[in-house]
Structure formats: C-alpha cells, structure tokens
Amino acid sequence: MDYTHQPALIPCGQDKYMPKSELLLHLKTYNLYYEGQNLQLRHREEEDEFIVEGLLNISWGLRRPIRLQMQDDHERIRPPPSSSSWHSGCNLGAQGTTLKPLTMPTVQISEVDMPVEGLETHSPTDSRGLKPVQEDTPQLMRTRSDVGVRRRGNVRTSSDQRRIRRHRFSINGHFYNHKTSVFTPAYGSVTNVRINSTMTTPQVLKLLLNKFKIENSAEEFALYVVHTSGEKQRLKSSDYPLIARILQGPCEQISKVFLMEKDQVEEVTYDVAQYIKFEMPVLKSFIQKLQEEEDREVEKLMRKYTVLRLMIRQRLEEIAETPETI
C-alpha cells in the first residue's frame, strides 16, 4: 500500500486526528482575526512534528477562593542576564540565598561636637582685645562614611518589594498580601499563558497555577469551553487546549476558555443549551407540546397493534374452522 500521498495528520486529542492542511486553514483564520496583536500564533516543525505556539486567553470562572503562596525571602531567584538589571540579584549570596545587610559600627557623637543654632559662642580672648585664641581641643567631623545606618530587619525596602513583584505575576493587580492571600478572582476576568500545541490540559493547568503562585492543587480545577448559548464542554486530560481554541475559532464573543472547579460545574450539551435561556412559561409550553406529541404517538401505536391483533385472531379462527385434511 502506498502511504506517500496520504495527508499529514495532527493529533487533537485521544485517538483524534485531523489533516494538517485543515488545521493550517483554521490557523490562518485565527491569525487574520488577531492581525497586529500579540495573540497571533506561530507554527514550526521540529523533528517532523508540527507545533503551534502562542498566548492562550483563559477566563477566571472560580466560585471558591484560591490561596496564594507566601513569598519566601530565601527563595532562590536568578538575576536576569542583562547588565542593566544587576541590582535584582545584588542581595544574593553565592548559593542564591539572601545576604543579611551589613551593619557598620555606630559612632557616638556627643552634644559638645554639635553647635547649637541661635546661641552665641564666647571664645577666650587676651586682655589686649586681640582675636580669640582657638583651643587645641580635637574635633570629630561627622561624615557619611563614619556613621552606620541601622536597618530594621522586618521592613522591606522599596527595591526589595520591586524585586519580589518582578518574580510574581498579579491577578488583576492583586499581589500576595498576608491579609488577602485567600481571595476569589473576578468572574470573567481574563489572563493568558504562553503554551504550545503539544501541551495537554493538565500541563496547561499547572503552568497557569505556577504563574500566579497559586497554592491549590491542579487536580481541583478543569478547563471548559463555554459558548454564549450556554453550552459547556470540559476539556479532557488528553486534549490540547491550544488546538481546541483554534478549532473553536478566534472570536471570544462566541466561545471562551474558562478555568473552573471540577466539582462545581457540569457539562451542558448542545441540545440542552438550546433551551437554557428561555423563561419558565416558555419551557412549560414546550413540555406541554412534547407531552401532546407523545400522546399522539402512543395512540397511533395502540391503533396499529389493535388492528394487528384483530387480523391474527381472524386468521386463527379461520384455521380452526377449516377441517383437517388427510
């Protein structure tokens, strides 16, 4: 059998494949929609594997609070290689630990050394009214290098706070705070992660939680494709979220990818989603119509089998009346 002319297939889930040409058409439409924006996707081939990579928008759909990890002052943070950012690692030791600030010895300065403003100083003079004679008392000149500064250990400087924030993303401007470390992100607010088409749903979940230093386990959450019609489709652990987003289309007014709790959300099929947005009186009228249609079908079946029953009985009677032939 000749396989040379078979189209290349791209995996899009467990035991699910699609032609590469079809995916490229979807990708072209996706990039045209986001032309000139950072949400455009790029593709490449690496060791005969077709890979798409870029940013994926994910909306927060959590109902319960999440816990942010506490920032560890001794956490190992690698300074960026840029020479202009040397200060981000200036407090790190050889093993990546934070060094304690050195305290210079404090020099005590007596009140005599400091002149008091507003008071006249009288120097001793000779009896002939000559210029005052300066005493040879040694004076201690205070300079910045002579006086050490005591820093309180429990207070972070502005540079320390900037360093911490550089290594921690915020959720809608919310950074870790010991008073607000447990909170619920605003429903529908959007974040994004940079992923590729080979990353499965669990991998994307772990990447998202690690980006914001969320302490909760990835097993508590799931990714859902939510349509404006109300349809909710949960992405399986074998699915590729970036491929799913491309196949759904780029417009987020039609469908979005949501991060939700596993035990709080149920999938809604397309057939059920058609009726979700109707009011109760309308839904009751639908039920009444369906009941009437069901009654008509039942009555039709009863008439059909009643006729069949009569035909069988007539035939049995005819057989009984006919004399047996030898």
From Swiss-Prot:
It is found in: Nucleus; Cytoplasm; Chromosome, Centromere, Kinetochore. One of its GO terms (cellular component) is cytosol. PROSITE patterns: RA, SARAH. Residues 176-264 form the Ras-associating domain. Residues 272-319 form the SARAH domain. The keyword Ubl conjugation does not apply. CDD domains: RA_RASSF2 (cd17221). The keyword Nucleus applies. Phosphorylated by STK3/MST2 and STK4/MST1. GO terms for molecular function: protein kinase activity. GO terms for biological process: bone remodeling; canonical NF-kappaB signal transduction; homeostasis of number of cells; negative regulation of non-canonical NF-kappaB signal transduction; ossification; positive regulation of apoptotic process; positive regulation of JNK cascade; protein stabilization. SUPFAM superfamilies: Ubiquitin-like. Keywords: Cell cycle, Centromere, Chromosome, Cytoplasm, Kinetochore, Nucleus, Phosphoprotein, Tumor suppressor. It comes from the Eukaryota. Interacts directly with activated KRAS in a GTP-dependent manner. Interacts (via SARAH domain) with STK3/MST2 and STK4/MST1. Potential tumor suppressor. Acts as a KRAS-specific effector protein. May promote apoptosis and cell cycle arrest. Stabilizes STK3/MST2 by protecting it from proteasomal degradation. This is Ras association domain-containing protein 2. It comes from Mus musculus. The gene is Rassf2.
